[in-house]
């Protein structure tokens, strides 16, 4: 299983990024293998529109099963849902990528069943 966590940096100790489409990085890990890969998303950080859809396409191309993020807009949510990628939301208590991954493994994050933002990550 591959999990992608929205991040401001490139490793498990990096701060999480609370916005899916405009996250600077996605830290990708297979919790069973303890491997880590980084997917840069800088092209979407300042995108005028379509950042969520483009980010979702990048995630889908990496065969991700689960996304952990603070917020996901409607277009990104629909794109992820269309390819059966589950989205889990973390709150303000989650500070690092490692915190998010641990909370998800322990069942402390809620699966998102609808967009959590109106768009543009807000």
List each language-model region with its residue ranges.
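Charged/polar interaction segments and conserved charged motifs
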Residues: 57-60, 75
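Short, glycine/polar-rich helix-capping loops at beta-to-alpha or helix-loop-helix junctions
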Residues: 72-78
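Non-catalytic interface/targeting segments
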Residues: 1-50, 54, 61, 81-122
């Amino acid at each position: 299983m591959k999990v992608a966590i929205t991040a401001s940096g490139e490793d498990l100790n990096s701060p999480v990024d609370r916005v899916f489409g405009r996250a600077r990085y996605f830290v990708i890990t297979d919790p069973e293998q303890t491997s880590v890969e980084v997917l840069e998303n800088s092209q979407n950080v300042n995108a005028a529109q379509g950042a969520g859809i483009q980010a979702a396409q990048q995630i889908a191309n990496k065969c991700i099963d689960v996304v952990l993020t603070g917020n996901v807009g409607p277009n990104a949510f629909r794109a992820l849902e269309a390819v059966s990628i589950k989205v889990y939301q973390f709150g303000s208590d989650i500070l690092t990528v490692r915190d998010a991954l641990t909370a998800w493994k322990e069942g402390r994050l809620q699966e998102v069943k609808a967009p959590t933002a109106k768009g543009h990550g807000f």
